[in-house]
Amino acid sequence: MLSLLVASGLVLAACGQGGSSDENKNDSEQKANTEQKQKGDTSGTSETGKNSNVIKLGDIKTQPEDAVKTAKKEYDGELKEISFEKEQGKWAYKIDLQKQGEEGEVIINSKDGKVMNKSTEKEDDYDKAKSFKYEDFKPYDEIIKKAKDNFNGDIHEWSLSRDSDEGKFVYDVDLQKGNSKQEFSLDAKTAKILKNEKDD
């Protein structure tokens, strides 16, 4: 009787170990699969994250002159500043227009050229010297290429406006490659680099 109980105990123990071994094996496989999946997800996320911060010159769909035309249909003012940046999670042009006593801002989606947002506000410091026509200056793609000759990154943002310190119209360009960022200021008439700084 005692030997039968011992034998039963051994069989149960063996079954328990066998089951446990299989469970461990399954757990290990599941864990490995989960880790692999997470690794895949992480790399996808970081890739997407990286891409969402910058845009390649060739991927910009709407040209600045078209964005300005669209903005002027929405608000009848003189062009004061144009900038290209991430707005509400989308690449967009922010067009600032001015007229006596008022300023307007129109945001244009770069992907489809449609208006995302527009606003106006009372403004007393109207300054005719800050108004310009985009076509009077070097096109933005020429400016970006000049900056890229010095630092081969993708576009993080750029803008064109009158720089009061320089006393002239200037393109400000931010390029990014990985974690490195470079900021440029270029003369809008000549494309001469006025400033080139590493942004840490």
Language model: regions and residue ranges:
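Sec-dependent N-terminal signal peptides
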Residues: 1-7
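N-terminal, intrinsically disordered, polar/charged segments of Gram-positive cell-envelope systems
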Residues: 3, 13-81
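Residues within alpha-helical transmembrane segments of multi-pass membrane proteins, especially transporters
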Residues: 9-11
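A short, surface-exposed interaction/processing loop segment used at functional sites
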Residues: 27-40, 112-132, 188-200
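Short, non-transmembrane alpha-helical segments in secretory-pathway proteins
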Residues: 49-85, 130-161
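Exposed beta-strand-loop-beta-strand "reactive/processing" segments of non-cytosolic proteins
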Residues: 74-108, 156-186, 197
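Short secondary-structure transition/capping segments
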Residues: 125-135, 165-172
